[in-house]
Every structure is written in structure tokens, then in C-alpha cells.
């Protein structure tokens, strides 16, 4: 399923369930402990999963040159919708030709290819403990040995996978278009549990304090215990969403196909604020980055929006020439984002002014990974780019 089809598919399914799908359900929930600083950002030398950390904040502690240069470009042959992971100076990314590839971070040379057998869409790899995990468009989860690209196990869901895996200890979390979030044993691929929703699980779950959080096409915000697969609570997400949730200090930030960005307090389960551009009414498919009291998100209105995390008031917007499905990343007071206009942008986090840009000439709808002073992103023309 292409990105452009997601809105129509969600709308069709949501319309059949909107009147009955959501009945608020919740179990008593103790107040959550504050997140540790390391949970809110990726380390300087790794970006091990989509958005860099369990909390999906899209923030890295690395330092990147003010005017980076193209270090290398690896030709993948087909569009990259998958976003890279970076671990131990190796880049892992899925391809539309159905491969998970490993490429050297410093030299851009291919280390190995794993053939999944079916195209890989937006599912982005997660890497931990010598294993790389990814989902494909026929609904198979793949586990691969990072040393040589040899298969370890596969697990079949009932529909395509656009969500990205999250590894927490010995558990792999994966959402599927069959409407379930799965908990799998990372070593064996055995199903530990399946949490069922009433529509697609498109976004990647963020995990804080042993609880997975995600909003989806059923217009419900879900919180699930990752050990048991039991629901902690479910509350209205107000609209269907293709974005993943970023979670900071017990507040979830995410965009919706109702043209809004929301801040949802998980303690009270109330919406703290809603942001909608006063003039441009377009959906948000991009996932938000959250850092230093600022929420940064790309919109299908062609704009990058920076919002006050407490109030939802716009701090600045920057207009590109095409829609933005790429999820921005942040490091060192800079915002890094691709646009379907073919440019990669670096903006000042405080002002929104362009610090640097690269004209690739092909849409950049995948999201960047930041590690070891480098930026890696794939284009729709099949080039995997590394800037340093």
C-alpha cells in the first residue's frame, strides 16, 4: 500500500467502526516515573531503530558539521521508503526490492544483502544483540544475523507491515495491518502475545516504563503492557493517524489525518492542546520530534512546524516545495528533514532558518538517521545518502 492510499484506506475502515469501535477501557494506572535522559535521545554513536530511541523522540546526542558534505551515495536500485538504523558503524535499511542491506557507515560499501522475498515498505530496521529485525509488505517479520546477513527466523502476520520493530530486552514489538500489535521472543520469533485493535496498526509503538503506546487507524490511543500484552488503557485519539507517537514526561505528541497535532496527557488521558494551521488544512503523516520544549513535525501542507510543547502555539514554520512525510530528527540545536521536493534541509531549531540544504532531485519521504557525526537517508530514486 502506497502512502497516498493510506488516507483513503483508513477513512473507509474507520467509517465502519467510528460509532462503535471506541468504548473507553482502562485499568488503574500508577503514575509513571520520569523518563531517564538516555531514554529521550539516541546515543551519539548509534540510531538503533526508527526515531532513534524507545520514546521515538527523534533526537540524537551526536554532533554534526554545520555544513555537511556528501560522504558517499550507495545505489539501491529502487525507492527507499524504509528509514535507516545505524549500529557499530554499519547502516541497515530495507529496500523496495525486498532486501535488508548492511552498508558501512564510513565507506558506503555493501557488507551483505538479505533477501526477504517481498518488498519492504516503510518498516525500518531495529538492531540489538547481534540481530536485525524488519517487516515486509506481505506481513512477515524477519530476524537476521548482523554479522553475515543470514536468516535467524521469520514470523508471519495476517497482513502487510508498515510499522517498524521495537526491541525491548528479549521482546520484539511489531504492528501489522491485520490490526494487531505483536510481542515476539527476540531469540526464537515465538509469539508471546497479540494485542488486537479494530483497524490497522500503522505507527511504531513508543515504549516507556514497560508500556507500549500507539495511536492508529481505529482512532484510539492504546497503552499495552509489553510483558503480558494486556491493555493498560485505551482512550480516544480523536482521529486516525499514520504517525508514530513521541512520548516525553508522560505526554504523547502525534499528528493526525484530521489536520491536527495533539498533546495527550497520559495521566488524565485528556488532550492538553491541539494545533492546526490557521490557513493550510492538510494531514500530518510525519512523526514528531520533541526536544527542549519544542515539538517539530512535517506536514502534507509542505511545511515544517515547530510548536511550543506546553501550549501548542506555533514558534515558527518553514515552507518547502512539496509535502513532507519524512519525520524530522534533531541534534545540536538543528532540525534535519527531507521533503518530497527533493531537498534535504537543516534548520535552526530556535528560529526555523535554513542553515544548509542539499538538492537531491528526488523525493525524500524516508526519515533520516543521525549517528557518529553523520546523516543517512534514502531517496525515492534508490540512492542511500550519507552526509558528514
At which residue positions do the language-model features occur?
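Compositionally biased, intrinsically disordered low-complexity segments enriched
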Residues: 26-41
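Blade/loop signatures of beta-propeller domains
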Residues: 42-70
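Short loop/turn segments that connect beta-strands within beta-propeller blades
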Residues: 104-107, 145-148, 186-188, 225-228, ...
Amino acid at each position: 500500500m502506497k502512502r497516498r492510499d493510506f488516507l483513503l484506506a483508513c477513512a473507509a475502515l474507520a467509517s465502519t467502526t467510528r460509532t462503535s469501535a471506541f468504548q473507553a477501557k482502562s485499568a488503574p494506572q500508577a503514575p509513571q516515573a520520569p523518563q531517564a535522559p538516555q531514554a529521550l535521545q539516541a546515543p551519539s554513536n548509534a540510531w538503533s531503530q526508527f526515531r532513534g530511541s524507545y520514546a521515538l523522540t527523534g533526537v540524537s546526542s551526536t554532533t554534526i558539521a554545520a555544513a555537511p558534505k556528501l560522504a558517499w551515495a550507495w545505489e539501491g536500485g529502487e525507492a527507499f521508503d524504509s528509514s535507516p538504523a545505524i549500529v557499530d558503524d554499519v547502516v541497515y535499511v530495507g529496500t523496495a526490492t525486498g532486501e535488508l542491506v548492511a552498508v558501512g557507515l564510513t565507506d558506503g560499501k555493501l557488507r551483505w544483502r538479505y533477501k526477504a522475498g517481498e518488498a519492504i515498505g516503510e518498516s525500518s530496521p531495529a538492531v540489538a544483540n547481534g540481530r536485525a529485525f524488519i517487516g515486509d509488505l506481505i506481513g512477515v517479520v524477519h530476524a537476521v544475523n548482523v554479522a553475515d546477513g543470514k536468516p535467524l527466523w521469520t514470523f508471519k502476520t495476517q497482513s502487510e507491515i508498515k510499522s517498524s520493530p521495537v526491541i525491548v530486552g528479549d521482546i520484539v514489538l511489531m504492528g501489522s495491518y491485520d490490526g494487531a500489535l505483536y510481542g515476539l521472543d527476540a531469540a526464537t520469533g515465538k509469539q508471546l502475545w497479540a494485542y488486537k485493535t479494530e483497524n490497522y496498526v500503522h505507527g511504531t509503538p513508543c515504549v516507556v516504563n514497560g508500556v507500549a503506546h500507539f495511536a492508529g487507524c481505529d482512532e484510539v490511543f492504546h497503552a499495552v503492557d509489553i510483558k503480558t500484552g494486556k491493555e493498560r488503557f485505551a482512550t480516544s485519539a480523536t482521529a486516525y493517524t499514520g504517525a508514530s507517537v513521541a512520548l516525553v514526561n508522560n505526554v504523547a505528541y502525534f499528528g493526525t489525518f484530521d489536520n491536527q497535532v495533539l498533546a495527550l496527557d497520559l495521566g488524565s488521558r485528556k488532550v492538553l492542546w491541539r494545533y492546526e494551521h490557521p490557513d493550510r488544512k492538510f494531514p500530518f503523516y510525519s512523526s514528531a520530534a520533541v526536544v527542549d520544549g519544542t515539538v517539530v513535525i512535517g506536514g502534507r501542507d509542505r511545511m515544517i512546524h515547530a510548536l511550543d510543547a506546553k501550549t501548542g502555539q506555533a514558534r515558527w514554520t518553514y515552507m518547502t516545495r512539496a509535502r513532507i512525510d519524512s519525520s524530522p530528527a534533531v541534534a545540536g540545536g538543528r532540525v534535519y528533514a527531507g521533503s518530497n521536493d527533493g531537498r534535504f534541509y537543516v534548520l535552526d531549531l530556535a528560529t526555523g532558518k535554513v542553515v544548509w540544504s542539499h538538492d537531491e532531485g528526488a523525493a525524500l519521504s524516508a526519515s533520516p538517521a543521525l549517528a557518529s557525526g553523520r546523516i543517512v537517508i534514502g531517496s525515492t530514486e534508490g540512492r542511500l545518502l550519507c552526509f558528514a
